[in-house]
């Protein structure tokens, strides 16, 4: 079985549905299936707006940058998934993804965002991407996805619109090369 947990999946150019030009961070991969978060499709909702909509009691002043909530995938779009650097905080529903990263689905992590208690780095997603047992492996064999080790700079710091090209460049591929490969093929 391929080891995909903690890696990026890069959509091949022929995927023309929801996953066109996406990068997915794989949060879980085992015999039962796979789950990940699209990291380069921002919604129109900023994390600050999400925080105010959830109406948390603001005990401290909150500082938010320009981070947007991303559309993590077409499944469970009403549910929040926070991928973050590991922290000493004991959040209720946290799943350790790698030695350095965890995913939390409970509101207690959201309550810390913008405060000194927040994880050092985090990505907030609505929805997730999931595959049944063996489904993702088949898609990889069918050349729907490229697999590459993840990178914190791409995951947390890079502008959303640059993440697809940067993930491809981890493999030495420039997305422009994909466009050239399509010329003359119908």
UniProtKB/Swiss-Prot annotation:
Disulfide bonds: none annotated. It holds the Pfam family DUF179. GO terms for cellular component: cytosol. Transmembrane segments: none annotated. Belongs to the UPF0301 (AlgH) family. HAMAP family: UPF0301. NCBIfam families: PRK00228.1-1. This is UPF0301 protein HI_0304. The lineage of its organism: Bacteria, Pseudomonadati, Pseudomonadota, Gammaproteobacteria, Pasteurellales.
């Amino acid at each position: 079985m391929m080891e995909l947990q903690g890696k990026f999946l890069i959509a091949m150019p022929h995927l023309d549905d929801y996953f066109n030009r996406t990068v997915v961070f794989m949060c879980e991969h085992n015999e039962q299936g796979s789950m990940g978060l699209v990291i380069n499709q921002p919604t129109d909702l900023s994390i600050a707006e999400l925080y105010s909509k959830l109406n948390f009691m603001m005990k401290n002043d909150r500082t938010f940058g320009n981070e947007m909530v991303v559309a993590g995938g077409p499944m469970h779009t009403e549910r929040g998934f926070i991928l973050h650097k590991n922290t000493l905080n004991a959040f209720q529903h946290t799943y350790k993804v790698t030695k350095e990263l965890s995913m939390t689905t409970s509101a207690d992590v959201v309550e810390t965002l913008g405060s000194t208690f927040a994880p050092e780095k985090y990505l907030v997603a609505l929805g997730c991407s999931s595959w049944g047992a063996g489904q993702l492996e088949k898609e990889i064999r069918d050349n729907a996805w490229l697999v590459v080790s993840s990178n914190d700079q791409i995951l947390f710091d890079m502008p959303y619109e640059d993440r697809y090209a940067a993930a491809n460049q981890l493999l030495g591929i420039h997305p422009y090369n994909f466009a050239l490969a399509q010329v003359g093929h119908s």
